Structures are given as C-alpha cells and as structure tokens.
Amino acid sequence: IGFAQGGTAINEAFASGQLDVAFVGDIPEIIAKSNGLEVELFANLNSEAEMGIVAGKNSGIKKPADLKGKKVVAAYGTVTYVYLNNLLQANGLSLDDVEVINDIANGGTLVASGNADAVVSTGTGVWQMSHSGVGDILTTSQGDADLSSQFFAMGRTNYLKENKVAAEAIIQALQRAKEYITQNPEKAYEALATSDNPKELYENIYPKESGFDNLDPQIKEEQAERMNSLAKFLLENGTISKDIDAKSAINNEYYEEAGKTFTK
C-alpha cells in the first residue's frame, strides 16, 4: 500500500488500526512515539539515506557557506528541514541565516525560475533536478551518517508480538537483498532502474566503492543516538511536544531470531 501523503498518513493509519507494518523515515517514527502510539522499529532499511542541495545556476552559491542570506526551499518538520539545519550548523551557520521557503513540492520550479536560490531534496531528487537542468548539486550527505536520514521497518507492537514470523520474514528478505547487491551490484542497479530513475542514479546513490553496510537490517546503537539528537531538534522546533528515548522504540529481538538463518 502506497501512502502519497507520507509519514502523517502512515501514523494516522497506525493509530486507527488500519496498518500493521510500514517502511518509514526517522521523523514519522519519532512523532508516533511522542504521540503515544504503540509501535516499534524492528529493522533498518537504510542507515544513511542520502540528502542533498541543488543550487540555482545563477544563485552564486558555490559552497555551503554561500547559503547565507539565500532563499532555500525545504519543508518544515521533514527530513529536508532537518538536513538543512544540520548542514548549516556544520558550516558555522543556522536556520536564521537563510530564508526558508516552505514549498518543497514546487522546489525545482522555484529554483529553475529564479524565485529561490536552492532546494533541499533526497539523493534521488537532487540527481533528477541536476540532470533536468534545474541547477547544480551543491553538496550531498553521502558518506556522512550525521547528515543523512534513516529509514526503518516499523510495526504495531501487538501485531509483531502475535506475528513474529512476519517480522522475521521481512528481515530475512532485507538481508537477502543486502547480500544480493553486495555480490551483484551491477545487476542490482539494472533491476532498480526505470525510465525516470536510470541505472546511473543508483550507481551514484549506492556506490559500490562505499560498500553496503548502511543496508544491514540490524538497527545499531549509534542509530538510536542519532534519533535522540533528531528528537531534541524536533522538540525545540515544536514538531513534537514530548521528548522520546529512541532506544525504547527499537526491538532487535526479531532480528536476532531471523539472524539464525543468515549465511555465515
């Protein structure tokens, strides 16, 4: 089932009991736990999901520090806003140093028309925009876990308890996928390719030279620490009203059981 509305719609479906398991980003999970939903993370999908920024060709932006005083498109309360904040801080700036335009759906158009100087997007988004002539890739989070987003498998706690085999089957499938792309990267790129997202895109987002440890289904302790930092940022910005402990939202028991079947 696809959710075009993203994390908000997914959390609403969990709350109403219409959804048992979903693949989500780190922000929806934090919001879900802050709102008291009985859900937990049981597998990692991507611990370093790439984010990036495309700068307009006439924006004068050549390095992240040049974003100061510029109009940057990002969506409040999403991974784009978080990435922008973290990138600015890493370069001695803050969100107060830029004018944020909260219109991510039209980000590419705004930059191409000169009504915005830069736009934040996912790795896929920045690649597509740069290749369609919107602008140039300023920077991405590739190779920097602290600037990257995370994606997980999340399920209703009671459903997972009653359907352990389902959770383990998902983890086993994720493990097989990781093993396949590790052993056959070129074939994996070709299998993922579409007319909109060609093989070259996946070669750039998932470079075989970097390895594929970010696709390991086990949720690591450092991932919980990154989520706790993210939760504090979301609390400070009013996205959530109550802080959470990410470690309490993670359940690796299903991974440990599924791991007994993995090829050593």
Where are these regions (language model features)?
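Conserved C-terminal helix/tail region of periplasmic/extracytoplasmic solute-binding proteins
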Residues: A231-K264
